[in-house]
Each structure stands twice: as C-alpha cells, then as structure tokens.
Amino acid sequence: MTIHIYNTLTRQKEEFVPLEENKVKMYVCGPTVYNYIHIGNARPPMVFDTVRRYLEYKGYDVQYVSNFTDVDDKLIKAANELGEDVPTIADRFVEAYFEDVTALGCKHATVHPRVTENMDIIIEFIQELVNKGYAYESEGDVYFKTKEFEGYGKLSHQPIADLRHGARIEVGEKKQDPLDFALWKAAKEGEIFWESPWGQGRPGWHIECSAMARKYLGDTIDIHAGGQDLAFPHHENEIAQSEALTGKTFARYWMHNGYININNEKMSKSLGNFILVHDIIKQYDPQLIRFFMLSVHYRHPINFSEELLQSTNNGLERIKTAYGNLKHRMESSTDLTDHNEKWLVEIEKFQTAFEEAMNDDFNTANAITELYNVANYANQYLLEEHTSKVVIEAYVKQLETLFDILGLELTQEELLDEEIEELIQKRIEARKNRDFALSDQIRDDLKGRNIILEDTAQGTRWKRG
C-alpha cells in the first residue's frame, strides 16, 4: 500500500515518493516564542508528529526539523513591555513550548534550530540572493525582488497581478514593489541587532526558515508543513527565496492543517476566544486533547467545545476500557486453538483498514474509526465462555501499536473511591430499572480498570484487582 499526500502546491493527492529511498526530509514551521501557545498553535505539532510517527512505522528514517523564531517584532514588543531582554523571554517560552507539546504526546524533532543560533547562514543566504540580483539593499533594509522570480504565487495559486493589487507599502518602507518583502531589517534605536554587510539589523521572518531548512536538510526537502495561515505569504516567500538561490525545487510536498474554531467562531487573539494549552491541559487529560484533534482530518477545520470534548472522552474511555478488559482476561485465557483463525483474520482486517486510512493523506479520523471497531470486536470476543491467549495478545498488541502510531497512551487514571461508589450506585439504579445492559457495562468497565465487584445479600462490595 502506497502513501498519498494532498499537495497544496498541485491541489491534488499525489503518491509519496521521497527523494532518497527509505529516508524522509521534513520541515515544520515552529512557533515565535513570545508567549504561551494556544490550541491553534498546538495543532501543527500534533498533526505532523503523527505524520512523522506513521512514516517511521512504515520504515522511513525521518529527519524532522522544526524551528524556533526567537527574534521578531512580537518578541521585541514583549521585551519592552516586560522590561526584560529578548533572549530571556525567548528561553522562557521555548521551555514552556516543550512542556506543552510533550504533554500532548509530541516527540522532539531531530533538530530544533533557533534563528539566533544560525545568524551567519541567514546573512550568507541573503548575500547570495543580492549577488544573484534577486535582492536589493535600501537604507539598511534588504528586500527580495519578487518580479525577478517567475513562479511567485504558485503555492497560493494567485496571479501575481492580483497579489500586487492587494499589497501595499507601509510607512517607512523603501521597497521597489509592494510585493517585495524584507530579508533584512535595519535596527531601530534600542533594538537587538546583529552586524551585517548592510549594517546593524536582524533578519525578516521568511528568510529564516529557508536558510535553516537548507542547512539541516539540503536544497530540496520532501515535506514542508505548517498551518493553513502560513501558505501565504510565509511559504510562498520561502519558495521564492530558496528556488531563486538554488534553481532547484524547494519542497516536493506541501502540507497545511486547517483552523480551529471555538464554539463555531474562528479562534483569534483579537476576539479574545483563544485557549492556552498550558491552561486546558490542567483541566483535561492532554491525551484527550490529542485524541480530539486527531478525530478530525488535519486539513479540515475543528470546532472546539467542551461538549464535543466530553463526547470524545466517552469514546476514548470505551477503547481504554476494552484494552483494560483484555489485559484482565489475559491471565485466565488458555492456549485454545479452536476458532482462533476467525478472530485473527478480523484483527488483520482492522490493521489493513487502519493503514489504508493513514495512507490516504494521513486520515486520522478514519483511522480512529478502526480503533472503535477493534474495541467493539474485542468486547464481543470477551463474551466468549473461553478465550485464547493468542487472540487476546493479538488484540492487546494491535491496540498498543495503533495508539503508539497516533502518539497516544492506553493507560487510565486510577479511579478515586468516591468515583467507584458513584458508579456502583448508578449500577444499582440500572438494575432496579431492569436496565441490565447498562448494569453489565458498568461492571465490565470497572473490571477493565481493575475494580472487582461482588454482589452480596448485604449489597455490592468492591476491591482493587
């Protein structure tokens, strides 16, 4: 089965064929570290960490690079407001970023380059563009000359005339064309700066990723990814800079994830409806946040609400409970061989369906449907009077493998005594109402979490297994 990726550049799904056999070069635009990340910022790390995990599962050696922009207008503004220097603020929020995304199940990239640690290669990149006639200096600033790059607009699929019509020259800018963008910005009084051939200053945003991608991954990379909002102008400008310099294709597959809405309204800081990751992971299990995010195809928008989160939690707990029940049954299962084939064939079908979903542009939504199917069939198998260790182990291994691909864990938080008593009372009410299906479900769910019930004449007793 081959992997197909929706390529923003061509607007169609294409078979994934890396430049080098069994190796993938992948660059994901990272955050500007001037504040804590919100859940919209967290979607790309979770999505593309999952892409990376699946590629590794399929046997690829993935070189995964994700940068930190640690000098920028927003950082300078934050430094001025807080009375701190830029490096101090950047260091603080790099650490906070790692805490947040690690909690959300994301592995560290192969390399996390920082702009301030790569200033020499950024300046060198700009100088080469100037030498080739693709950039020009203007009163200490350096701009990219967009009219010199023939393919400008090919990622956003907009004619250059339309792009120019919507562009403007800001006050203080000395550029030749409204579409030209800054590669180097002359330092203003009191700002952090670096020495360069054009005087003291700092790099523009777009050039940073081009230079660092080239340093760590080479002239051409396999996958370049980020949020949908980065397609234009950031990624468009990256293509222009990189391909103008090297004359080679910069990235072969462009992937962009969709936006996040809060209660059906687009999330934005201006509306004040954003949710910080470090706040929400105190309220909800970070694994639930990740599972929720992956329950929607990465290119589609997500509507984030507490009601939807709770509904998703019910589904996640159902899978975890099935896993717990399987583990609990392991000890009492035997070496039966009768009827194993029927169940093992079904398990293989689920594996195939899961991989087909992931091969289809990393469709985690459909892949998660297969997790529910595995859990449902496992529960059916557990109703058998006698169960086989071979089948139980196959179900357990499958759930563990599929969860690992999605960056998820199967552990459940231990129930508090009062939570157990509450569930027992709910079960008693269900039995009074002759709702035996609910009664059995509660009993089985508790058993899956190592809580054993014993019905006696004096009432229901329980113990931890």
UniProtKB/Swiss-Prot annotation:
It catalyses: tRNA(Cys) + L-cysteine + ATP = L-cysteinyl-tRNA(Cys) + AMP + diphosphate. GO terms for cellular component: cytosol. The modification Phosphoserine is found at residue 270. The keyword Disulfide bond does not apply. It holds the Pfam family DALR_2. CDD domains: CysRS_core. Disulfide bonds: none annotated. InterPro entries: Cys-tRNA-ligase (IPR015803), Cys-tRNA-synt_Ia_DALR (IPR015273), Cys-tRNA/MSH_ligase (IPR024909), Rossmann-like_a/b/a_fold (IPR014729), tRNA-synt_1_cat_dom (IPR032678), tRNAsynth_Ia_anticodon-bd (IPR009080). One of its GO terms (molecular function) is zinc ion binding. Keywords: Aminoacyl-tRNA synthetase, ATP-binding, Cytoplasm, Ligase, Metal-binding, Nucleotide-binding, Phosphoprotein, Protein biosynthesis, Zinc. Its cofactor is Zn(2+). A motif ('KMSKS' region) lies at residues 266-270. GO terms for biological process: cysteinyl-tRNA aminoacylation. Binds 1 zinc ion per subunit. A motif ('HIGH' region) lies at residues 31-41. It is found in: Cytoplasm. Zn(2+) binds at residues 29, 209, 234, 238. SMART domains: DALR_2 (SM00840). Its main location: cytoplasm. ATP binds at residue 269. Its EC number is 6.1.1.16. Belongs to the class-I aminoacyl-tRNA synthetase family. Monomer. This is Cysteine--tRNA ligase. It comes from Bacillus cereus (strain G9842).
